[in-house]
Amino acid sequence: MSHGPKGDINKQEWEDVEFPSICERCLGDNSYVRMTKEPLGQECKICSKPCTIFRWIKERGQKPGKTQICVGCARYKNCCQSCMLDLQFGLPIALRDAALKLVESGPTNDINREFFAQNQQRLLSNGETAYDSQEASAAARNLVKKVEKRELHSRPPKRKLDDVESKQILKEARASDASLNAERPLFPVKKIINGNVSLSINMEPPKDKKIASLFLIGVEDELADYKIRKHFEQYGPLKSVVCSHRAKCAFVNFKTRSSAEIAAAASPDGNVVIEGFRLKVQWGKPRSLGGPEGEVRNAKLADLVMRGSSHGNKTSQKSTIKNIENEDHENTKSPAVAIPIDPNQPRYRSQIPR
């Protein structure tokens, strides 16, 4: 009499899930995430059982996310399958367990780890869990809150570009100008200090009488094309406004050279404010901004230029405010001071000696 193969209880306990347990930080803000599933694609880093791998891309250009542990261990540890951070406090599970002493570390032997995971899976299926945050003592909870303020879920600040990176971006921009045989560079850089770029803008009309366009730097997404058109129409009729929000730049093309000269004369220092947005303006001949790569490069240069100009404006504003305060102090009259009354001075006429 032949018998079938003996069933393996460990294989019966292998997981087959349709969706992972991931925190919002790892999943990202996109509501339409494309996720791939690979059943039994790896070994869980906690219980060493085969588990399903889920992969996804949070944002374009970033490294794909991936699950590291099985769903059972994630629920038992109350952590994310990808970053393995606690879902309540945002801390590494080893630090959390040491502080709160809620979850045991478990066995280290492979076979014992599988047996331990089976028992925990059975508890979860019955609606029980070994993790209970209410059991934490007040002292341990205060310790976790102190560590939580310094831990991982705060986003790191954006790194500023240094002089080397700024010069590399500028070098690429000059190479693009040379390939187009451009007479005037889009970004006439004067100097670079601490990653900030200052321009040497010359608002004198160019010798080429055919140039009747102005080039704007620092065009944000909130500044629409029609607002730029509305601002410059006061100086004369416009031929077109070519705006690239991705490059943070725009060309304002006038129908006549005289209108362009009037608009340039209105901004002798190369600064213009449109609907509350501060921009840099200079003469420029319309041309391509270099495709997607060139637009990204020009956007970085525009950020460096606007950051450098804002730094200079802050210094000048401080000195201006200080001068205004000094003038106000000089022009302010001293307040009237009441003279104290002598207590021996007679208050009534009858008390005055004759």
From Swiss-Prot:
Residues 310-323 have a biased composition (Polar residues). Residues 212-286 form the RRM domain. One of its GO terms (cellular component) is post-mRNA release spliceosomal complex. InterPro entries: Cwc2/Slt11 (IPR039171), Nucleotide-bd_a/b_plait_sf (IPR012677), RBD_domain_sf (IPR035979), RRM_dom (IPR000504), Slt11_RRM (IPR034356), STL11/RBM22-like_N (IPR048995). GO terms for biological process: mRNA cis splicing, via spliceosome. Residues 308-354 are annotated as: Disordered. Belongs to the RRM SLT11 family. This is Pre-mRNA-splicing factor cwf5. It comes from Schizosaccharomyces pombe (strain 972 / ATCC 24843).
